[in-house]
Amino acid sequence: MLSVKNLKVAVEGEEILHGIDLEIKRGEVHAIMGPNGSGKSTLSNVLMGHDKYEVIDGEVKFLGQNLLELAPEERARLGMFLAFQYPKEIPGVSLVSFLRAAYNAVRSEKMSLYHFKKILEEKMELVGLSTAFMSRSLNEGFSGGEKKKAEILQMAVLEPRLAILDETDSGLDIDALKTICDAVKKVRAKDQSILLITHYPRILDYIAPDKVHVLMEGKIVMEDGEELARKLEAHGYDYVREKVGIKKAGLKIVN
């Protein structure tokens, strides 16, 4: 479904991703883990087409199409979705208006407000968000957990083929995290792929990955199954540094 080969990315002339390789098949869950500043969110933004980043080498294909030639809205229509780590507040734009516009933007047939509200009510019940939020401005005055629920609600409404969840666990306590993960599992289609971007392994207690990738210094330095996340939980990222030969001071790759 998603194929990333030798992806190199720069910001303001400085290379920050150094040859990323990643393969995600239909229906798989992959987790990208790494310490702060390792390039995790950069990768998710590049996949969705953020114009801040310059792709200087490599290939990215989704469903056989060259993603690097597509605008962000074209990637969304193709079936990609990004849940943001820090969802923005949009005063004056109601949740229902925003979601209906997003829904109609990725489909050839437009849906009336009446019929869309019927669908939205069902999705809101799945994610545990009151229908009272429909008329509220998007994310304005929402708690951290409510903002994350609104992101998962977008995922439920848009039904993407690949959902990228960028540190969805950030800022959530254990109870809120479990609630969000339960919502993800409820709205996820069987053939939907998920790319989890996370710093901590605790989210993987609730959403089991098929594969875990460790990103450091802009490179994927280790890959394995779910057991790799358990090793990181027990030993921290020093476990990876020792295995692959990365100096903690300065974090320079020495192998």
Residue ranges and their predicted role:
Residues 33-35:
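The feature captures the beta-strand-to-loop junction immediately N-terminal to the Walker
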Residues 59-75, 139:
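ABC ATPase NBD Q-loop/coupling interface
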Residues 2-4, 17-19:
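Conserved structural motif at the start of ABC-family nucleotide-binding domains
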Residues 155-156:
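ABC ATPase C-loop
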Residues 164-168, 175:
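Walker B catalytic motif
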Residues 215, 219-242:
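Conserved beta-strand-loop-alpha-helix hinge in the C-terminal portion
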Residues 151-152:
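Hydrophobic anchor residue at the start of the ABC signature
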Residues 82, 86, 92-107, 119:
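Q-loop/switch helix immediately C-terminal to the Walker
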